[in-house]
């Protein structure tokens, strides 16, 4: 019986290419997709974009806001990893409200849903990401700063058509982050602003161990629990111009992932002592270009649009979003 289990393990190795030497860039496209799905929610900057974008609108002197405001925002994202070995697309929508909690402080809450699809080789994956969170921002003189925190539940679906594998599993995420920005021309009274900035993003992803039937094997395939800590930061400069009915801005920054970009995935077959391990090292260094602006539509309604390009050595992302703000 033990020999049979070893045969099934060998079949598993052949089917999904679980290489014994888990070196970066040597994994199969299917493995790469599996590893990317594990860190996808942590890499997302949606929460940062929602909180920071909302507060930037509030701090725009040309856009009206009141003690309590509501906002609605959606964005799309297109991704490529491993020199196009894996591609993906995301759609997200979020809604929230905020209020004045001090002379210079604004505090809000929000909820978000994000839908991500990834494709690589003969595999495809789907991730559904639900979040609730809060944010707080303060503008004092030339300084603008904010922080945010959120909690989310993830529904993951991985399908490998080659061997008829169709797995579903869940995870949880806790994230926090923030940004500090200083306007070098705050006291000039000019419509042009030059602002160096630095931001940080940290999160923990928690996925319990789960087991699924494996085609042709008498026992289940077991995925060991994943607990991954992720940390990234970015620094750069923002050029912004204020207009009579809004503003527009350009950002150029350098992003660095310090930890958690390559969680280790471990699989085993029930009844067999051997385990199979692999990970995929996503790029750690990126150039980040962002273009955006806000336009006042009516007395109480404004719209914000933004596009961004994130470029690494092997991986890249393209982002676009739009937001509506209501002041009551």
Give names to the regions the model predicted:
Residues 27, 66-69, 74-328:
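Membrane translocator/pore-forming domains, dominated by Gram-negative outer-membrane beta-barrels
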Residues 1-16, 20-87, 169:
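Outer-membrane translocation/initiation segment of Type V secreted surface proteins
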